[in-house]
């Protein structure tokens, strides 16, 4: 009985509780009103921007990142061309584990996701243990792409074989 409360229960006994009628038994505690209001505001914001504009912005940043990363030695971009993506750039850097790359990028003020992304079958198909994943959205701009590229270039130089 100690794990139940609010309107989800009809009655509490010493050794058990009885459920309330629908929909109350699925609505324990205080409703998450703040998040509902925040979600509505976010939806209004995106509606005002227009989702076509959001997608165009993402793809422009992806194209820019793809272009500027193209000549980084050992860098492989995984997935379709930028025009067929929506905000996500998956890549690997030869001889650099994505977790190490993420740490270096963090030191450059760039936050990425590194790992298998709950997609181990894909990682096996790609022949890699993990990938790095950069994401772009409405709050990113060309400066963020530049920071990503600088950080990746730094990592490539740091892990380059001696004399290379």
Put a short name on every predicted segment:
Residues 1-164:
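Pyridoxal 5′-phosphate
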């Amino acid at each position: 009985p100690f794990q139940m409360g609010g309107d989800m229960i009809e009655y509490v006994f010493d050794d058990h509780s009885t459920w309330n009628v629908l929909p109350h038994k699925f609505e324990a505690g205080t409703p998450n009103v703040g998040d509902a209001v925040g979600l509505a505001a976010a939806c209004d914001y995106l509606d005002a921007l227009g989702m076509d504009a959001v997608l165009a912005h993402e793809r422009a940043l992806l194209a820019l990142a793809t272009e500027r990363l193209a000549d980084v030695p050992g860098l492989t971009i995984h997935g379709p061309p930028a025009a067929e993506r929506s905000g996500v750039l998956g890549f690997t850097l030869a001889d650099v584990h994505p977790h190490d790359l993420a740490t270096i990028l963090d030191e450059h003020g760039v936050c990425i996701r590194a790992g298998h992304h709950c997609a181990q079958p894909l990682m096996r198909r790609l022949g890699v243990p993990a990938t790095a994943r950069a994401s772009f959205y409405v709050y990113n701009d060309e400066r963020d792409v530049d920071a990503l590229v600088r950080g990746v270039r730094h990592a490539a130089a740091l892990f380059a074989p001696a004399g290379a």
